[in-house]
């Protein structure tokens, strides 16, 4: 059902006028999607959303959330449990300090029988929770991270997995991404000066940074010791997991590939959830530039001028 709406939307283009027209149309598509999907889900009860299929490695979808988002998270959960390619696990991580009773929120209980697992973690690592704790528990799995406010089309997971199968296994796969631009000093330019959305670029490339909202697939063995340095995460980029993961890719020689050069944007489940959006906060306050500067200094062994 969601795939049908995404099929109606226009992919992002380099031409600004075309993009402006496409934005207006896509805004209408998003509005209709948000209004009709809950009714569709009520009329078509969920079946089991996970499977025991043996893939190249266990296929796990992982995400996190927080109390303010829980009332609207159901649509995202529905969209993941209705994938045409079923994962082996769907994990939702919640911080114990935000959910001290360690009880599954009422809004989520109906999804447990369909395959959702809700787990409680000791430390609130903000957006890092969605990858950190799953990678710690299942290091040899294929881990797909998603956002808790996005409606994912039924073919989303299949598209990521097929791109992974057709790529070098030292490649991170994403739907959406930005292209890092390098300055005259052979260091990354400011975050807001990058090639946002990397329109027309598919990769694989060292300079593509996956955009978490679109969904990202990390191959088995991607998460090394450096990734689990909680102190470094806290000190440098607690609110920017995308940047931390990008530097892990660069440290260990992983390139990034998009599933398609001209990607389609993803749509949130509810308009009002945007006020809690981490990306909006980081970008609006230019905090990503601070996080980026911190990481460039910490990982000064990266030779930016050699990246392609």
Residue ranges of each PLM-predicted region?
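C-terminal catalytic/acceptor-binding lobe
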Residues: 2-40, 56, 225, 232-308
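A conserved hydrophobic helix/loop-capping motif in glycosyltransferases and polysaccharide synthases
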Residues: 60-68, 83
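Residues at the starts of beta-strands that form the adenosine-phosphate
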Residues: 88-89, 142, 255
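Short, acidic, metal-binding catalytic loop of nucleotide-sugar glycosyltransferases
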Residues: 76-88, 96, 110
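Short beta-strand-to-loop acidic/aromatic patch adjacent to the donor-nucleotide binding site
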Residues: 140-151
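Conserved catalytic core of nucleotide-sugar-dependent glycosyltransferases
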Residues: 134-135, 153-230
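Active-site-proximal specificity loops/subdomain of glycosyltransferases
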Residues: 93-141
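Cell-envelope/extracellular polymer assembly enzymes that use nucleotide-activated donors
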Residues: 57-62, 89, 244
């Amino acid at each position: 059902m969601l795939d049908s709406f995404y099929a109606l939307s226009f992919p992002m283009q380099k031409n600004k006028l075309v993009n402006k027209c496409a934005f207006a149309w896509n805004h209408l598509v998003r509005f209709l999607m948000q209004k009709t999907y809950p009714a569709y889900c009520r009329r078509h009860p969920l079946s089991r959303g996970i499977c025991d299929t043996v893939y190249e490695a266990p296929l796990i979808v992982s995400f996190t959330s927080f109390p303010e988002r829980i009332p609207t998270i159901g649509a995202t959960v529905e969209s993941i449990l209705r994938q045409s390619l079923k994962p082996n696990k769907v994990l939702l991580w919640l911080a114990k300090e935000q959910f001290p009773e360690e009880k599954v929120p009422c809004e989520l209980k109906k999804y447990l029988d369909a395959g959702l697992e809700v787990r409680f973690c000791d430390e609130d690592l903000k957006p890092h929770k969605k990858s950190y704790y799953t990678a710690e528990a299942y290091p040899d799995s294929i881990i797909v991270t998603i956002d808790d406010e996005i409606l994912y089309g039924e073919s989303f997971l299949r598209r990521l997995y097929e791109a992974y199968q057709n790529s070098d296994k030292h490649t991170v796969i994403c739907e959406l991404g930005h292209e890092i631009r390098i300055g005259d000093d052979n260091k990354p330019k400011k975050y807001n000066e990058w090639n946002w959305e990397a329109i027309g670029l598919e990769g694989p490339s060292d300079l593509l940074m996956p955009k978490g909202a679109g969904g990202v697939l990390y191959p088995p063995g991607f998460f090394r010791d450096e990734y689990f340095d909680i102190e470094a995460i806290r000190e440098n980029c607690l609110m920017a997991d995308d940047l931390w993961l990008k530097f892990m890719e660069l440290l260990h020689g992983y390139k990034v590939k998009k599933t398609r050069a001209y990607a389609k944007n993803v749509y949130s489940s509810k308009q009002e959830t945007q006020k809690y959006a981490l990306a909006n906060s980081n970008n609006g306050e230019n905090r990503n530039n601070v996080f980026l500067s911190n990481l460039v200094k910490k990982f000064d062994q990266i030779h930016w001028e050699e990246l392609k």
